[in-house]
Regions:
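Expand to "…catalyze enediolate/carbanion chemistry for C-C bond making/breaking, isomerization
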Residues: 208-212, 220, 224-231
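Conserved alpha/beta-domain cores
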Residues: 1-205, 213, 225
Length: 236
């Protein structure tokens, strides 16, 4: 199947999942995870109607920006971001989804202040409490919100999570539901620089379960572009 056909099929599945959950399909965004896909593939996905593109690596982001690969859609950064590469991302993307530490939060705020902008971000939550993954612990999110007013050049737009890898349908629903309840808890309070209207969770293998649990953005790569060939990955 072509990229356009894959996008159409994912949209169909998203609609089915949304309607089954009593939700409006238009309230859920499709973010194309473009890691290891070239500028032409990205352009095809945008032409097929994805809502935004998500890039995992600073090197790829920089190269594709130079090629105008993202024209026609917002670009987000969705991979682990090192503090020494913040300058290459802040102001270049509409949303940084993967803010996983207070140190990174502060670095983004400083760079945004230097540029005279407000950078939109999501806080990444290590919802499965996995030692191999970065992210804030769920119990640290609400206390962190009390300090967000100190960072005047960032705006928290919501939360992002990558649950543990599972090959069993529905197994990650408990993590998705925990994320949803955490986002509700934040919305019920009033914090400076916080507008929690985005809940980014769900990928190629589990986006239907994420939608059933309240996701407002799914990040899909393999189901759009096909399996990645890591043997040919020269950027590792």
């Amino acid at each position: 199947m072509s990229i356009a056909e894959n996008v159409a099929e994912i949209r169909r599945q998203m609609e089915v999942a949304a309607l089954a959950a009593g939700r409006d399909p238009k309230g859920i965004l499709l973010c194309a995870a473009t890691k290891m896909n070239d500028a032409d593939a990205v352009r095809q996905a945008i032409a097929a109607g994805v809502d935004c593109c998500g890039e995992n690596r600073v090197q790829e982001l920089t190269a594709k920006l130079a090629q105008n690969a993202y024209d026609g859609a917002p670009v987000h950064f969705i991979g682990h971001l090192q503090t020494n590469k913040v300058r290459q991302v802040v102001g270049k993307v509409s949303l940084i989804q993967s803010v996983d530490s207070e140190r990174l939060l502060a670095a983004i705020d400083r760079e945004a202040a230097r540029q005279g902008i407000v950078q939109d971000i999501l806080l990444e939550v290590n919802i499965g409490e996995e030692a191999s993954k970065s992210g804030f612990a769920a119990e640290d999110i609400l206390p962190l919100m009390e300090k967000i007013g100190e960072f005047s050049n960032i705006c928290i737009k919501g939360l992002m999570a990558i649950p543990p890898i599972s090959h069993i349908s529905g197994e990650n629903q408990k993590f998705f539901q925990k994320m949803f309840h955490l986002s509700v808890d934040i919305r019920q309070k009033k914090y400076d620089n916080v507008e929690v209207d985005c809940l980014s969770m769900g990928m190629s293998g589990d986006f239907a379960d994420a939608i059933a649990s309240g996701s407002t953005m799914v990040r899909v790569g393999t189901a759009i572009f096909g399996a990645r060939d890591y043997a040919r990955d020269s950027s590792k």
